[in-house]
Amino acid sequence: MQPIILAPDAYLRAVTLRDLTDPAQGPHALQRVVQVITAALQTRWQCAIREHRAHPVVPLEHNYDRLHYPPEGAARDARYTRYVSETTVLRTQTSAMIPSLLRQIAQQPPRDILLVCPGLVYRRDQIDRLHTGEPHQLDLWRIAAQPLGHAELHEMIATVVDALLPGAEYRCNAVAHPYTVDGLEIEVRAGSEWVEIGECGLALPAILEEAGLPVSRYSGLAMGLGLDRLLMLVKQLQDIRALRSTDPRVAGQMLDLELYHPVSQQPAIRRDLSLAVATTRTAEELGDRVRQALGPRVQSLESVAVIAETPSEDVAPEARARIGMGPGQKNVLLRIVIRDLVRTLTSEEANELRDEVYLALHEGSAWQWAGSRGQSV
């Protein structure tokens, strides 16, 4: 299957988006998160540290093959991955930096080193208060000329959680990763919810061998953390959009790890949309389409949620006609919650946003507008 190549304007927006973990692009609290984690692990292990950054456009091979993803795996699908060309992608994980970095350190094999790889990653994801299409991740790989096993892995988990969230309750669930053995998902309790902050496991021996680090001498631990989620927990933020806010009252609080003080509580405006879309469309794909259509104005959307999906054959004929549903389509009831972080939107502004979302997603032949666009049709 031919991949869907990213449009030039979407590519430009992606590669010029500020990486909040990079001090060269200005200070941000996410940098403090990286510093605190790195310092805690270095103190625990007394190991060397190597921080590494790389351009977000990577060969497909680095993002998947070298990490032992199966050739026909679903993760490679253009529904989840943003292709720059047939052979390059915007990295979906900071783990894409690891195989090449392992080859570099194999030239002068370490006794004990922690690889620290922060940066932006790019997903096609849903829109809500916890998700963004461009989250920040941190890969941490400890490589040592000694056996590293489950005890060291759990020590790593405890050190990271205690460094940022002292006393927090956390749990680990078994999960499979192609580049680890005995993988785990890490969740932290936040009130009545469990929030995933990352995944980890023992480094896959084959990856070390392929990099020139024989497993007869070397072993490794691998961990990937969601930095945005961690910062939200530390500062008790309720909305991920605050991390990129340009309002001085919000941005000024994104420079440290102190608790966040809400600027204001804007009222939520809800709009429900009845859409005809291809039967293969996913919630993540719909969210990504909205981001591409609205650009920076997506910051005014708190969430975009699929409420119901109905196959064409189960939709009443009059309803099919009303939305112009055709063959190979399904009816999606979508709820958008419009709430700007710093100002109250007018009903007219909310309707215009609703219509732009509708225009980006609806694939039927009949249209139902809410704002002035409908008056001009």
Enumerate the predicted regions with their spans.
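Long, well-ordered mid-to-C-terminal structural blocks that present hydrophobic/aromatic surfaces
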Residues: 140-141, 145-146, 162, 230-232, ...
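Long, charged, glycine-rich C-terminal linkers/tails
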Residues: 47-62, 170-177, 302-306
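Short secondary-structure junctions
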Residues: 41-48, 109, 161-169, 293-304, ...
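Amphipathic alpha-helical segments
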Residues: 30-44, 152-165, 285-294
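Class II aminoacyl-tRNA synthetase-like tRNA-binding/catalytic domains
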Residues: 1-131, 142-143, 194, 199-208, ...
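A carboxyl-terminal module marker
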Residues: 178-190, 194-377
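Short histidine-centered catalytic/ligand-binding loop motif
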Residues: 21-26, 138-150, 271-279, 346
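Extended C-terminal subregions enriched in glycine
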Residues: 150-155, 159-184
